[in-house]
């Protein structure tokens, strides 16, 4: 009898937890593609690889929301990245390297604490026809020395971040993020500050963002190491004409050491065709501190929806470089098996083609 009462008490406690918790969801993405790259070098110029995370980073995540009453909710996200081609974890082996935050939401907006996407990355992603992915996206353009260094230079995610996002106010929304450097005796080093504002109404989307990073020696940031006071400004927008969605964006990156002065322009389009979309973009980058420091990426792709959760995709990119630039198409937003990448050289033309499948669950 005592055992029965104990069992009922345990079950009752679980039921109480379940009733208080509005929802807990496990979700994920598995994304795999066959890709071939040619960096234009005289020797060892080509590589064929099976890689993970081309259109979207492969991941496993957990998210939940608890209704606290009065329009207030508590929520969390724990999301880990993986290389589906090898089964290994990504983001430097950190357990929840993609996202890990807890927060409160309500009529005042949303406040999140933890590792999360930066406002400027979300702004860039909302304008890019490739969603900063596949091989034509702005996130898939980098240098051999800088790793996943995007054309716009935006940090994907930041640690130790306090983020406030407004609710939608007549089409307007905004976000402010402050990331603590957590260095003894220095409140500046390692700090990251980001803000963004967006107007979205009907066919129109306009967004602007700014990010300032102070000497972040963090391998989990993207780019991996940012020099003193790196400042990034971004403005972009889209207009949906139904037959085509046009996109235009501008970015500028500078730092206090006068080692970076990049200007970037992106012109793109999304054309609905059948159960999918044709994607196209041109991205131009110029380093004003370097003579012959220009690069241009031309990309085209297609996504084909097999269902609401599964799609096929393919894309091709061609990146041309002046004598003192070595940009090229990385595989996509990642994570990736680094062995699948190929070194890039100044003044060379890099091409990449892939075909893959993405499944969401």
Q: What are the residue ranges of the model-derived segments?
A:
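Outer-membrane beta-barrel architecture
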Residues: 9, 61-63, 101-103, 163-165, ...
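Detector for outer-membrane/organellar transmembrane beta-barrel domains
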Residues: 194-304, 317-318
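Gram-negative bacterial Sec-dependent N-terminal signal peptides
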Residues: 1-21
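Outer-envelope beta-barrel architecture signal
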Residues: 4, 22-28, 66, 70-74, ...
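Outer-membrane beta-barrel "beta-signal"
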Residues: 345-361
């Amino acid at each position: 009898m005592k055992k029965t009462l104990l069992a009922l008490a345990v079950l009752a406690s679980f039921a109480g937890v379940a009733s208080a918790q509005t929802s807990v969801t496990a979700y994920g993405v598995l994304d795999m593609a066959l890709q071939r790259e040619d960096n234009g070098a005289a020797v060892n110029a080509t590589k064929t690889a099976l890689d993970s995370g081309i259109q979207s980073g492969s991941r496993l995540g957990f998210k939940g929301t608890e209704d606290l009453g009065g329009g207030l909710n508590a929520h969390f996200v724990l999301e880990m990245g993986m290389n589906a081609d090898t089964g290994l974890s990504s983001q430097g082996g950190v357990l929840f390297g993609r996202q890990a935050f807890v927060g409160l939401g309500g009529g005042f907006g949303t406040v999140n604490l933890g590792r999360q996407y930066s406002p400027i990355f979300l702004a860039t992603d909302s304008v890019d026809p490739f969603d900063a992915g596949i091989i034509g996206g702005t996130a898939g353009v980098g240098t051999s020395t800088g790793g996943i260094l995007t054309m716009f230079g935006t940090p994907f995610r930041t640690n130790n971040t306090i983020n406030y996002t407004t609710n939608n106010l007549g089409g307007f929304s905004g976000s402010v993020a402050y990331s603590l450097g957590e260095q003894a005796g220095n409140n500046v080093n390692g700090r990251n500050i980001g803000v963004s504002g967006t107007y979205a109404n009907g066919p129109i989307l306009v967004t602007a963002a700014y990010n300032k990073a102070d000497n972040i020696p963090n391998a989990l940031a993207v780019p991996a190491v940012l020099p003193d006071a790196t400042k990034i400004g971004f403005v972009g927008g889209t207009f949906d004409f139904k037959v085509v969605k046009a996109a235009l964006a501008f970015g500028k990156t500078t730092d206090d050491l006068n080692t970076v002065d990049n200007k970037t322009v992106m012109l793109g389009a999304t054309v609905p065709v059948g159960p999918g979309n044709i994607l196209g973009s041109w991205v131009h980058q110029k380093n004003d501190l370097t003579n012959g420091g220009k690069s241009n990426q031309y990309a085209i792709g297609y996504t084909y929806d097999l269902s609401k959760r599964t799609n096929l995709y393919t894309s091709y990119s061609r990146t041309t470089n002046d004598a003192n630039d070595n940009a090229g198409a990385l595989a996509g937003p990642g994570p990736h098996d680094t062995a699948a990448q190929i070194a890039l050289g100044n003044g060379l033309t890099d091409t990449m083609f892939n075909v893959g499948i993405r499944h969401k669950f």
